[in-house]
Structure formats: structure tokens, C-alpha cells
Amino acid sequence: MEVKVSMENSEAGYKSVSIYSNSGIILEEVTDRTNLREACKTVQKNRGAPGIDGVTVLEYACMRETKGYKELSQIIDAGKYRPKPVKRVYIPKANGDKRPLGIPTVEDRVVQQAIANVLSDFYDEKFSDNSFGYRPNRGCRDAIRRAIKYANEGREWIIDLDLSKFFDTVNHSKLLQVLSKDIKDGRVISLIHRFLRAPVSENGKVSEKTKLGTPQGGPMSPILANIILNECDEMMDKAGIKFVRYADDMMIFCTSKKAAERTLNRVTKFLEDKLFLKVNKEKTKILNYSKGTQFLGFSLTKRVPKHIKETCPRCTIYVTVH
């Protein structure tokens, strides 16, 4: 099936091309009214505060029940949808710092969720088996089980890798380049780009269009994070590097300290040179399980009873929840 993209869309900033159903995601999948309706249900379920327009989730859902989704679908299809500025708030962190959180309007959240639904369906089978964050039927406990498995196989030297302000520093051009490898419909890429560049509203002042990052708080951010970090996952899988990743939290498992040092250099070079991300060298650590470590809110501890230390060089890795 061929889908024609009109010159009107081209004038709105989209490429005038012919899109085929075998070319990956097409815009009509995003704007399908059933998908938009399901996206609205997800936003309702997640609740959340109003964006800069003050419209609540309940108010928006009631309005859509009355008006339906035809008009919204047509606006997006015509290339005329424009995201509103994202409302910025700050959430306290355990260490006393504050984490910036972006609150899009409810309608923008619905459209983002519609995009995320389609991206997730398309990309999930492409993701590494060692990736656990924001994926169907996977969670923290699955990530911990995989970490325990790798450690019990003798890979007890661990790289606890920290990406510096990951969500705020994702390079838009690189992300769009990665997306374009699989998505040939320029209309989809342009719509995602508009959301990435949406201005930020803070204390009543609206900034210029955003140049970096996928603000935490938008439904698209988790899947976009997985898509760009899957580039590094693929490199590690091909190299036989054992790792566990949950969104931007990553642990890499090695058999010796020297191997861990070499692997850290290789992974850091890829993340910084290929994906234009920044590894936080102060927080990134190489450690041994014998001293215990934290991952995703769990304590991973190697317990060796004194009377078997000499006869049992390996032991079970235990996990306790905090």
C-alpha cells in the first residue's frame, strides 16, 4: 500500500515523498483514532498535573468523549499540530538536589503517548535482551535477576556507569538520525522533532525552542531513551560484553579489574564519540561484589560464611530491598 504525502505537508515542514507500508512507521498509525483513544486512556490512568493551559486530565477526557478524535487526527495528518510550551517544575531528590520535570499539556501528552505506543510496538523486538526499563513485561526485579546471574557466573568486577544528566543532554540530531534508520516517513520524524524542541515555561517566562534533551515527564521520553541507548546496547552485545540496563542506569559485568578498565574505556568512547552523551567520571565506579553495591534501589551483597571461605571461592549473590 502506498501513502501519498501532499505538497501541503511539504510546505508545513515535511518532505514530499511516497511512503510504503513496509518502510516502518507511518504517520497514519500514530493518528489512527483508536490509537489516539487508547493514548488518552493511558494519560487518564497516569493522571498528572495540568500543563500551562490549566486543563486537567478529567476535563480533557470529557471534552474528547464529546468531540471525538477526528479533528485532532486531521490536524496532525495535515502537519498543523504544534506542541505548547512545557511547564517546568522541580522535584526534590534524596541528596538534596532538585530534578527538573517537564509537564506538557494534557493534549500534548495524549499525542506523545500515541507516538510512544507506535514506537514501542515497532522497536521493542529490536531492543537488547539486557535492556529492562520501560518495556512490556519487564521491570526492576528482572534486571536484578539478570545482574545476579552475571555475577554468579564469575563476572564479579562491576562497572557502575553514570550518564551525566542523560535526559537533559540527548542530542536531537543524533536521536533523529537513529530514528531515521527505521522510520522513512519524514512526517513522523518532524512531529517527534517538534515535541523535542517545544519551548519551556518556567515562572511565567517561555524560553526559546529546546536544543538538547528529552524532558522527563513526557510520555515519549522513556522510549526515545531506549532507542538511542540501544545503539550502545547493540555494540556491547556484539562485543560479548555482559551488562544490565534500566533506562539510563547501567551496570557492566567483567571477570577482572583490568577487563573492567578496558571495557569502561571502550563504552565511554562509544557513548561520548558516537552518541554525544557524557559519562560522569566522578560517579562512575569500578567495584567488586565482595564489597556490595546498590542497583535500582536494591542492595546486592556477596555473603561468604567464614567456615567455607577457603573451600568455596564462589558463592551466591544475595539481594535485599531498601
Where are these regions (language model features)?
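Short alpha-helical scaffolding segments that buttress acidic/His motifs in well-ordered protein cores
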Residues: A39-V43, A114, L191-L196
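Conserved polymerase palm-domain catalytic core
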Residues: G68-E71, I75-Y90, A94, K126-G292
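A conserved non-catalytic segment of reverse transcriptases
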Residues: R197, K274-H322
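Acidic, glycine-rich two-metal-ion catalytic cores of nucleic acid-processing enzymes
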Residues: V86, T105-R109, D121
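Electropositive, glycine- and tryptophan-enriched low-complexity nucleic-acid-binding patches
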Residues: Q113, N117-N130
